[in-house]
């Protein structure tokens, strides 16, 4: 636990016997809860790192940091800390010089005290009622200023003694003043609701909770008297000095401090972190403090002039006693050519000195008395509008011409002369400067006239040099080189490398004070450093040589080898903790080289990195708007400035060509804009016709264009009626009368049965049974029978019943046959319906699947439409901004007519009505100056905008050529994705592009290799991919693959895909903090700077309540449309979610029909068919037997014929021809 001391403090009384001395006893048990808020100062004046910093704030003269980290100079180096356990009624004095540090809590320093901090170290809200009644600041010169606050406003200049500055939370507002002899000199403002810290610097700054409340002359001592309270609080008094530190701030309070007091802490400060990981870090350049000045000039005969400027200040008191500097204060220049208004330097050298006098007056303007007490003031000359400071004139600044003047005529810039009082700086006059840049005249600190070589060199140490006009900071060293030509020598980048002394011809080198280095940090300590020169740094004394750099380390290389020998002969066997390319550093600081080829026969990557490559895409249409022209603006300058007032127009002529320049600039810009737009765009009448939807749908418009093509748009849009369903003239239909006279019966038929039946009957009902049809071998008749058929078959049935007993039942046979045939028709219909039912169910399920897929595509389309609407909304927002920008600029220009620019009114006529002509001219001159400034700002903005539009117009040309007329290979140029095609259309003031691109929806992450490091015997070489569009990676199967970066399509790498490089070393280029400004120039926000300037003058403006009805400019308001598009986009997104649910529901509605049973019945042939078959068989078999057995030469018929023939005719027997065998089938 920290040891806490509270010392006995006896302070001299400054208010007589009214207050007793402050008696403080040692802290006992009551201090136990305050240990977290009070610290013991560490050796060197450092605050412990575990201190909570309750109620410690960053002191600032400008804005306050809310949260973050920054490196800053703050009074955080504690010389002495006094803890006080409670407020006592006492009066105490604290001085910056000669303070008694005999008894302090912790270490004590004897440094110069810069700031005394009073901290209420308590975390809870302590109620006010304890604190100082008044703070007295004993400034230089013996003047004592008092600061106190009151709970209400005080109207007179006399303040009673009830004021106070309470510590802790205050009840209600407290109004603070600076007092002198009981008279208010200045109102400071309202006290914060809770006072946690009061800090006072010896330079006269008074801080409350870190904010600069008040500034005055330097302070010697601080006195205050304490009130008495009934609650125990704890506070400390810290005597502090400024030091550089890394400060972490949260909610405006300090939470952590890292002192930039050592090499490793300097790196922490440069990296803005209190903890450093193991690795290499650039060593930040140390700040060059007060160094010697080296100047190298050519020997010459010089003349010198002393320019003495005398400033006589006139001071008065206000009605409340505040000091006021009179504008009648005079500036006296040396007389030249009987003129004291202008003085020009006519010698080779000059030195400027300022002498200040101060006289005071009571109520008149006769300044005779000496300035005493609060009226004491000193003249100071501030920079003003000049690009150099007044106090730097004697610091070897060079000119071709330099003059000081009391009149602004012909001046290039001016210095501001102010009277510095104990409360503030008050502007009194301006000192004008007429100068030309060059080297003829030099400002020097002292007289060096005559023939001299004024060169002053400080060798082998860091010096601020000016060598033949080239300035910088570096170390100048004498060399042994001899160069015949040249005066000074620079590198290709323009840095000064050396110079020659023309008197003796000696060559001197110039090197930076700090060189670039990389520090190796392991476990928070510096173990080594890499540098380009052989010079000790970072307190590292051991070093070794590598082929490319020097390495300094804590490792003692001299134990075994000679100090400074190459690293190759100092092989160290240790495991590197950090690596840098092929360099490794061990924990003991030893440097080792890592050979990337030392592996078990496996190849190694030169370097690797994870990349994501698309595997799937979706098509997206992205909208982009580009402005290509602006609306020309012309302004009547004299009308704008003077509004037709003749006296104002006469004054305006004194501004030479101001109006002409403004008007010509706008006109020239407009003409140039129109010429470029006309050369870029042309209007086609046919294109204008096509731009109309009505004309596009008209074939008359397209006929002259597409004579040899079908009329695109017109023909097909008009011809829709030809492809819509219509009546077919070839088909025959019954008329409406026929539909009334006949009953229409619709049935389901079997194939062509019905048509064949109708064709057979010919309309005769008697042919019904005769025309019976057969379907798949079964006799059928149509199922519908008209009245005649029913009568016929009824009669047949009745006749059969009646004659059945008499043997006439056969009459009913037609009826029975017809009934069975019709029943067969119905049965076959049922079979066909069953098959149709199966076909229907299959088709329905297939339709459901198609519907599901269709809805999925609709869902995707709506999703893409939603994204498209979003891009359209963004493009419309940009269109709206472009269209309204010029209107807003004109509106802002019109608003400037309301500003009076510190004149008594913004109306010129009103000014001339209220003042005499001379005074009115002065007021109107302010209006003219202000309005011309506004016009200049508008012209500058317009010309800048035109330059931006000119660049945008060129971009539109490039996009038309690359995106619309061709396909771009540049990713992201034609939409954010892989470009397919683009369409362009006109838009307000520009063009709108519709880019169709492929957007990745899925990715594959691979570890890409920049190249392969291979070993060939003793030679190490690298292989890199020949085509840079391909990515090399190694898969899990240890094979190398190549894939395009645009889509993941891996293929096996072959030897033809690689080219060989010499080595595997990777070159890392580093820079230091000092080099960053040359790489990243400081960004200066001009708009913010102008805004800050305007804010400083705004309280002095009088802005009348004027309407803006006179201003009329088209204002494009697409906010509602953009909001509607965004709403529709969101609604479409919600629709996609609903469609996804509907698709799931549709998938659950697939039909599973219950099939009808199919019964197959084999119908036997009738009996008469079998009888007929039997008769045919009985007749045909004997006939066949007869033909086969009785014919031929051996047949009985043939034998019988031969016998008969031989008997009756001998002659015929001789001419016998054999009979051939005949088969009868």
Curated annotation (Swiss-Prot):
Residues 798-819 are annotated as: Fusion peptide. GO terms for cellular component: host cell endoplasmic reticulum-Golgi intermediate compartment membrane; membrane; viral envelope; virion membrane. Residues 553-1225 are annotated as: S2. Residues 433-577 are annotated as: Interaction with host ANPEP. Pfam families: CoV_S1, CoV_S1_C, CoV_S2, CoV_S2_C. It is a single-pass type I membrane protein. Residues 1081-1178 are annotated as: Heptad repeat 2 (HR2). Residues 1187-1225 are intravirion. The keyword Coiled coil applies. This is Spike glycoprotein. It comes from Porcine respiratory coronavirus (strain 86/137004 / isolate British).
């Amino acid at each position: 636990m920290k040891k806490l001391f509270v010392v006995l403090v006896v302070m001299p009384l400054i208010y007589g016997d009214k207050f007793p001395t402050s008696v403080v006893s040692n802290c006992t048990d009551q201090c136990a809860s305050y240990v977290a808020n009070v610290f013991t100062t560490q050796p060197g004046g450092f605050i412990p790192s575990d201190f909570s910093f309750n109620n410690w704030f960053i002191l600032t003269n400008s804005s306050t940091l809310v949260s973050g980290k920054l490196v800053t100079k703050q009074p955080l180096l504690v010389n002495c800390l006094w803890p006080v356990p409670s407020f006592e009624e006492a009066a105490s004095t604290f001085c910056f010089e000669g303070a008694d540090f005999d008894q302090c809590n912790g270490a004590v320093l004897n440094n110069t005290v810069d700031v005394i901090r009073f901290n209420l170290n308590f975390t809870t809200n302590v109620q006010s009622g304890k604190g100082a009644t008044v703070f007295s600041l004993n400034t230089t010169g013996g003047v004592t200023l008092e600061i106190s606050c009151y709970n209400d406003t005080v109207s007179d200049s006399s303040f009673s003694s009830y004021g106070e500055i309470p510590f802790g939370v205050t009840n209600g507002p407290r109004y603070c003043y600076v007092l002198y002899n009981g008279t208010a000199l200045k109102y400071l403002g309202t006290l914060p609701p809770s006072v946690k810290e009061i800090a006072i610097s010896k330079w006269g700054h008074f801080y409350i909770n870190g904010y600069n409340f008040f500034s005055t002359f330097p302070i010697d001592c601080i006195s205050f008297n304490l009130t008495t309270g009934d609650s125990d609080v704890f506070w400390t008094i810290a005597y502090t000095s400024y030091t550089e530190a890394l400060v972490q701030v949260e909610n405006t309070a300090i939470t952590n401090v890292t002192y930039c007091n050592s090499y490793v802490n300097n790196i922490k400060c440069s990296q803005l972190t209190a903890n450093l990981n193991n690795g290499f870090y650039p060593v930040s350049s140390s700040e060059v403090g007060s160094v010697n000045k080296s100047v190298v000039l050519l020997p010459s005969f010089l003349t010198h002039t002393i320019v003495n400027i005398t400033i006589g200040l006139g001071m008065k008191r206000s009605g409340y006693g505040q000091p006021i500097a009179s504008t009648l204060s005079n500036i006296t220049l040396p007389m030249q050519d009987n003129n004291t208004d202008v003085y020009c330097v006519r010698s080779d050298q000059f030195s400027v000195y300022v002498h200040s006098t101060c006289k005071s007056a009571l109520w008149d303007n006769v300044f005779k008395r000496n300035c005493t007490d609060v009226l004491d003031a000193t003249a100071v000359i501030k920079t003003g509008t000049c690009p150099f400071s007044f106090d730097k004139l004697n610091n070897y600044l060079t000119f071709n011409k330099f003059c000081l003047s009391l009149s602004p005529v012909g001046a290039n810039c001016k210095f501001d002369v102010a009277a510095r009082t104990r409360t503030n700086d008050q502007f009194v006059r301006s000192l004008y400067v007429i100068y030309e840049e060059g080297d003829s005249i030099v400002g020097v600190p002292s007289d060096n006239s005559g023939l001299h070589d004024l060169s002053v060199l400080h060798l082998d140490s860091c010096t601020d040099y000016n060598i033949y006009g080239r300035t910088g900071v570096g170390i100048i060293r004498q060399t042994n080189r001899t160069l015949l030509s040249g005066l000074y020598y620079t590198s290709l980048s323009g840095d000064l490398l050396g110079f020659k002394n023309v008197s003796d011809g000696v060559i001197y080198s110039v090197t930076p004070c700090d060189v670039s280095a990389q520090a190796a940090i392991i476990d928070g300590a510096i173990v080594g450093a890499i540098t380009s020169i052989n010079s000790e740094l970072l307190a590292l004394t051991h070093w070794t040589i590598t082929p490319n750099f020097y390495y300094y380390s804590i490792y003692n290389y001299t134990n075994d080898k000679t100090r400074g020998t190459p690293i190759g002969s100092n092989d160290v066997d240790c495991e590197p903790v950090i690596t840098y390319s092929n360099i490794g550093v061990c924990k003991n600081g030893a440097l080792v080289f890592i050979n990337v080829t030392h592996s078990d026969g496996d190849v190694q990557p030169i370097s690797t990195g994870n990349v994501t490559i698309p595997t799937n895409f979706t098509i997206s249409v992205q909208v982009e708007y580009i402005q290509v022209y602006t609306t020309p603006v012309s302004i009547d300058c004299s009308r704008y400035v003077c509004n037709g007032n003749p006296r104002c127009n006469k004054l305006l002529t004194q501004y030479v060509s101001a109006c002409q320049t403004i008007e010509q600039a706008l006109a020239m810009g407009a003409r140039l804009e129109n010429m470029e737009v006309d050369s870029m765009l042309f209007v086609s009448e046919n294109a204008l016709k096509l731009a109309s939807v009505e004309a596009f749908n008209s074939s008359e418009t397209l006929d002259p264009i597409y004579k040899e093509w079908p009329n695109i748009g017109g023909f097909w849009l008009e011809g829709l009626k030809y492809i819509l369903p219509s009546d077919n003239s070839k088909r025959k239909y019954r008329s409406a009368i026929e539909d009334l006279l006949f009953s229409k019966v619709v049935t389901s038929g079997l194939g062509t049965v019905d048509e064949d039946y109708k064709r057979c009957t010919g309309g005769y009902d008697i042919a019904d049974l005769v025309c019976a049809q057969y379907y798949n071998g079964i006799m059928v008749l149509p199922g519908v029978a008209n009245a005649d058929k029913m009568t016929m078959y009824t009669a047949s049935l009745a006749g059969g019943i009646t004659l059945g007993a008499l043997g006439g039942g056969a009459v009913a046979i037609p009826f029975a046959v017809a009934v069975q045939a019709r029943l067969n028709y119905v049965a076959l219909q049922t079979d066909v319906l069953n098959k149709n039912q199966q076909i229907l169910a299959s088709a329905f399920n297939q339709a459901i699947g198609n519907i599901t897929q269709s809805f999925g595509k609709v869902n995707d389309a709506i999703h893409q439409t939603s994204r498209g609407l979003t891009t359209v909304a963004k493009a419309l927002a940009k269109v709206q901004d472009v269209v309204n920008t010029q209107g807003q600029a004109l509106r802002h220009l019109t608003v400037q007519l309301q500003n009076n620019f510190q004149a008594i009114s913004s109306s010129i006529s009103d000014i001339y009505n209220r003042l005499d002509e001379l005074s009115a001219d002065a007021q109107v001159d302010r209006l003219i100056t202000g309005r011309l400034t506004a016009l200049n700002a508008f012209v500058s903005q317009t010309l800048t905008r035109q330059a931006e539009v000119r660049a945008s117009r060129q971009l539109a040309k490039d996009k038309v050529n690359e995106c619309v007329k061709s396909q771009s290979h540049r990713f992201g140029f034609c939409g954010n994705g892989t470009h397919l095609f683009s369409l362009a259309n006109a838009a307000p003031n520009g063009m709108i592009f519709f880019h169709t691109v492929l957007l990745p929806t899925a990715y594959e992450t691979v570890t890409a290799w920049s190249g392969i490091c291979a070993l060939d015997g003793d030679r190490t070489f690298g292989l890199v991919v020949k085509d840079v569009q391909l990515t090399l990676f190694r898969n899990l199967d240890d094979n190398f693959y190549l894939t395009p970066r645009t889509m993941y399509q891996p293929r096996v790498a072959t030897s033809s895909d690689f080219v060989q490089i010499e080595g595997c070393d990777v070159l890392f280029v580093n820079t230091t903090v000092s080099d960053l400004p040359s790489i990243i120039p400081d960004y200066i926000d001009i708009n913010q700077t102008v805004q800050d300037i305007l804010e400083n003058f705004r309280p002095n403006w009088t802005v009348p309540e004027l309407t803006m009805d006179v201003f009329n400019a088209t204002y494009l308001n697409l906010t509602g449309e953009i909001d509607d598009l965004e709403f529709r986009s969101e609604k479409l997104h919600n629709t996609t979610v609903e469609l996804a649910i509907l698709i799931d529901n549709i998938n659950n509605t697939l039909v599973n029909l219950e099939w009808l049973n199919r019964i197959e019945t084999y119908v036997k042939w009738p009996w008469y068919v079998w009888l007929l078959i039997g008769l045919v068989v009985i007749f045909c078999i004997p006939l066949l037997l007869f033909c086969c057995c009785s014919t031929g030469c051996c047949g009985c018929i043939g034998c019988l014929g031969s016998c008969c023939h031989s008997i009756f005719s001998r002659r015929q027997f001789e001419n016998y021809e054999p009979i051939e065998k005949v088969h009868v089938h």
